[in-house]
Amino acid sequence: VELLISPKNKIYKPCSSKAFFMDTTQYFYSMKDVLIVGGGIAGTTLAWQWHLQGKSIHWIADDAVSSSHVAAGIFNPVVLKRFSPVWKAEEQLEVLVPFYTQVQEQLESQIIDLLPVWRRFHDEKEKKTWIRKSVREDLDNLMLTHPEDTALEGIEAEYGYGVVKNTGWLDTSAFMENSMVYFKSRNAFSKEVFKYDRLKIKDGELSYGDIHAKAILFAEGNHLPKNPWFKHLPMQGNKGQILIIKCPGLKLEQIIKSSVFLMPYQEDLFWVGATYDRDYNDETPTEDAKNFLISKLETFLKLPYQIIEHKSGLRPTTEDRRPFVGNHLEHKNLHVFNGMGSRASLVAPWAAKLMFDKMYSGVEYPAEMDVARFQN
């Protein structure tokens, strides 16, 4: 189709009955609603939150290995050491399943599995504590009161289990990798290292190379300290290590939680983890962590198994164990979305919805997660 350029810098495009015109600046580039930076659970969740709401995005992520690639993606609304609810658990659960279900439908592949978590009791005292706490108003929707005494072949559990409701796991690798393919096919994803000095901020608009956006959302995990606009936030890395084991004799339809989690992963493969270490020298797996996981696993797994893989990653955690969500004090269209920690698969969909609602409807963030708590 021939394009006609008018003397007034307008483009006219002939069609069947009439011509229409647009400003040349809009012809040569389209303004995205948001530019998203970061490829972990956080960045992937933001991409889908905006896309599912009909907003235009461009998403940039690199090949760096993050804790998201190591994580089991277990979503569990109960702190299983103290038998207490996770912060904002009920609100997070309201968002979680509808969000991941919508993503599954778009990807046409399964990314979540709604498996129960069985908390193995170590003694009779724990069992009694579970029964007592499970009837509390803030826990009765999260914990079954009656202990589970079903014997599982290969698992030693003399005192039985407490069953947590509304649990399961997100296949983090499938979620992230399939999402990148999905958005790349729509020219909305670039695999590259984000260069801060290439971001131009002018008159309330942003440009990064030939990408133009109304706002940018940084979801960079442990790269946050390198971000010139948000490096003041007190990020604390937390190293986590896990094992993938092969145990053909073990048949599980639930996630077992004892000193460590034991989760069915693929046929005859199980995820074991994880460690939590704030003092570390690098991201590589260590023999000490491997031995720790083995020792904890063998207190209750009584079947032969083979270690297939030993992985490690750094979790983006915060001093107060609350996410970093909000905008820059001076540049209002620069936003941060970080610090989801070890419960990212549970927290991120809810936090992403809050960010969307804040940006487009003015809904306020909970004070505990708003980065304004560090900007005064």
What are these regions (language model features)?
Residues 73-154:
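Dinucleotide-binding Rossmann-like beta1-alpha1 core, especially the glycine-rich loop
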Residues 84-92, 162-178, 284-288:
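Short beta-strand to alpha-helix junction loop
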Residues 42-53, 73-74, 79, 110-111, ...:
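Active-site substrate-recognition segment that forms the wall
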Residues 37, 211-222:
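Short hydrophobic core segments
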Residues 52-69:
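Glycine-rich FAD pyrophosphate-binding loop
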Residues 31-40:
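Beta1/beta-strand and adjacent pyrophosphate-binding region of the FAD-binding site
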Residues 163-215:
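Helical element adjacent to the flavin cofactor pocket in flavoenzyme catalytic cores
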Residues 311-376:
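C-terminal catalytic lobe of FAD-dependent flavoproteins
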